[in-house]
A protein has these predicted regions:
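Cytosolic juxtamembrane helix and N-cap/initiation of the first transmembrane helix
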Residues: 1-28
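Juxtamembrane loop-transmembrane helix junctions in multi-pass integral membrane proteins
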Residues: 5-15, 49-56, 76-86, 109-116
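Hydrophobic alpha-helical segments of membrane proteins, primarily the transmembrane helices
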Residues: 18, 22, 59, 63, ...
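Hydrophobic transmembrane helix segments
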Residues: 23-64
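Juxtamembrane helix-break-helix junctions at the cytosolic face
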Residues: 66-93
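Hydrophobic alpha-helical membrane segments
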Residues: 85-104, 123-125
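Membrane-helix boundary connector in multi-pass membrane proteins
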Residues: 97-118
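Membrane-water interface at the C-terminal end of transmembrane alpha helices
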Residues: 123-147
Length: 152
């Protein structure tokens, strides 16, 4: 019975880490949408017409960057090794740091509300997600996984 309880607790911890990274990814998407709307609004206010500010490459970049945020959430769910959890921690932390740094830079250029949105929507959930990933990484034995054949 104890093994079953340990297995369920480890599974719950992995799911909690994945959920926290998804909350952080959602916050990043909200921040990016607010930043884009603010940028377009400033372009319209300054010139009276909306120029084509985003080309096809910029839109692809936005889609790819928003899609990369799913990787830190998926790794703890599908992998049983600590290397995957470490990769989730490192990639997620890197994404949080770069998004917040970009948000602070854009906040200096476009207004304080952009920086505040980056801090509230990305940094705050990112700290909790990184902390949960670190705790999961420090667990002495984490045998639970959702896919038994995973070799990551």
């Amino acid at each position: 019975m104890t093994d079953l309880m340990n297995e369920l607790a480890a599974r719950l911890d992995r799911q909690k880490v994945a959920l926290l990274w998804l909350v952080c990814a959602t916050g990043n998407t909200i921040y990016a949408a607010i930043q884009i709307f603010t940028f377009v609004n400033r372009q319209i206010d300054s010139s009276g017409a909306a120029p084509a500010a985003f080309d096809a490459m910029a839109l692809w970049y936005f889609g790819i960057v928003c899609s990369i945020w799913i990787i830190p959430a998926l790794l703890p769910l599908v992998a049983r090794r600590r290397a995957a959890i470490l990769c989730s921690f490192l990639l997620g932390s890197f994404l949080v740091v770069t998004s917040v740094a970009g948000g602070l830079f854009d906040g200096m250029r476009d207004g304080f509300h952009i920086a505040a949105t980056a801090i509230l929507a990305v940094a705050l959930p990112g700290v909790y997600a990184a902390r949960a990933s670190w705790r999961l990484l420090r667990v002495a034995e984490a045998p639970a996984n959702l896919v038994n054949a995973s070799d990551i």
